[in-house]
């Protein structure tokens, strides 16, 4: 019997939960994390979500939808610190942990020697309890035989959910779910599938023939059909010393059409990936930006530097041209990702400006040290600062 050894961890309203761990008196209130002026909602409590507040809703609109919404500013360094602690707890259960984003990831319990599903469930329940007791946040878990089904399961009973999908029941588990539960099907895509094609539930998709699916989803129809059947052979990818690339992606709750907002997301990913590259003693040469549209089509484009680097600055000028080359359709985006490849650990060759580069590297090392000690926002790049209106 195949055991449900793939686990998806999804922290509940992560940014807000981290803030409420510091301000427990606000638990149970309608609150959200975000910028009050010209900002967007980064995370909303479940009480605020019940009033119609979602991510990434503009703050001004959120306050109209929910006038008694309590706005909480970002606490510098808090989220990365709690995220690191959360995944360290995961690694006490298994070394095979994939950090998919700051608040979610996968665990592979295959090598742990569990004999029964009950043993696995007991161990994961224990991890869920540890996270709540030690970090004062909650997380939801999905257990299945593959990543796709585990991810869907983890989101069904939030907050503090725990859903197990036994082996062999994947298609049966997915069939009655709304089509919007499949990864990549956002609200607008779901509205189109329901309104134009009558595909309301996952089982409705499976009732369509191949030709019709291709007409609806284009080249991505096989991926959609396999997803509806619960088929997924992707392994849990752990970080290791001989990594051939470093990557990060972000899927948006609502499609984003703002070029400036996507630029900020990409630069934030650069800022989060390069310290890890430095920590590993590596340098990278190539940056690739990938975008995905609501219909699951995607495009990517990459550029390479003349020499490998472990600094952020050389990659910032590539963000705008790469986005323009990848984002060719005049449509909002559902997902964006950044990937660094051309990984090397050889010293940079001496050049005319080698001394200046070494100074920048020493400065980066100091900033990394400060941010590790006090949090990742102790020292920020200019583009990380929220835009503020001029004084009146």
Swiss-Prot record:
Cofactor list: Mg(2+)
Documented EC number(s): 2.7.7.7
One GO cellular component term: cytosol
Subcellular location: Cytoplasm
Matching CDD domains: PolY_Pol_IV_kappa
Disulfide-bonded cysteines: none
GO molecular function: damaged DNA binding; DNA-directed DNA polymerase activity; magnesium ion binding
Function in brief: Poorly processive, error-prone DNA polymerase involved in untargeted mutagenesis. Copies undamaged DNA at stalled replication forks, which arise in vivo from mismatched or misaligned primer ends. These misaligned primers can be extended by PolIV. Exhibits no 3'-5' exonuclease (proofreading) activity. May be involved in translesional synthesis, in conjunction with the beta clamp from PolIII.
Protein known as: DNA polymerase IV
Organism: Opitutus terrae (strain DSM 11246 / JCM 15787 / PB90-1)
Designated gene of the protein: dinB
């Amino acid at each position: 019997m195949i055991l449900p050894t793939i686990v998806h961890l999804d922290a509940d309203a992560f940014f807000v939960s981290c803030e409420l761990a510091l301000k427990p008196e606000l638990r149970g209130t309608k609150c959200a994390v975000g910028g009050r002026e010209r900002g967007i909602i980064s995370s909303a409590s479940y009480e605020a979500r019940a009033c119609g507040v979602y991510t990434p809703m503009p703050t001004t609109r959120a306050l109209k939808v929910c006038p008694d919404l309590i706005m909480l500013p970002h606490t510098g360094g808090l989220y990365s610190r709690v995220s690191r602690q959360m995944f360290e707890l995961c690694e006490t259960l298994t070394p095979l942990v994939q950090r998919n984003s700051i608040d979610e990831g996968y665990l592979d319990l295959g090598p742990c020697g569990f004999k029964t599903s009950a043993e696995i469930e007991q161990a994961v329940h224990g991890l869920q309890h540890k996270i709540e007791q030690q970090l004062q946040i909650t997380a939801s878990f999905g257990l299945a035989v593959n990543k796709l089904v585990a991810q869907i399961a983890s989101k069904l009973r939030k907050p503090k959910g725990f859903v197990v999908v036994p082996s062999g029941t994947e298609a049966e588990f997915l069939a009655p779910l709304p089509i919007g539960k499949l990864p990549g099907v956002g609200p607008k895509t779901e509205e189109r599938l329901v309104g134009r094609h009558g595909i309301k539930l996952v089982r409705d998709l499976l009732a369509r023939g191949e030709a019709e699916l291709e007409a609806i989803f284009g080249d991505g129809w096989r991926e959609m059909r396999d997803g509806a059947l619960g088929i997924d052979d992707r392994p849990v990818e752990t970080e290791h010393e001989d990594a051939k690339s470093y990557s990060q992606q972000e899927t948006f709750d609502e499609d984003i059409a703002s070029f400036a907002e996507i630029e900020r997301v990409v630069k934030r990913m650069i800022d989060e990936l390069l310290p890890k590259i430095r920590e590993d003693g590596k340098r990278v040469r190539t940056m690739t930006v990938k975008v995905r549209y609501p219909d699951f089509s995607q495009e990517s484009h990459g550029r390479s530097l003349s020499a490998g680097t472990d600094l952020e600055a050389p990659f910032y000028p590539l963000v705008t041209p790469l986005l323009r080359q990848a984002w060719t359709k005049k449509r909002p985006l559902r997902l964006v990702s950044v990937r660094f490849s051309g990984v090397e650990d050889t010293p940079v060759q001496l050049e005319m400006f080698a001394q200046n580069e070494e100074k920048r590297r020493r400065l980066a090392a100091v900033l990394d040290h400060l941010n590790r000690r006090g949090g990742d926002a102790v020292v920020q790049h200019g583009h990380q600062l929220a835009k503020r209106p001029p004084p009146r």
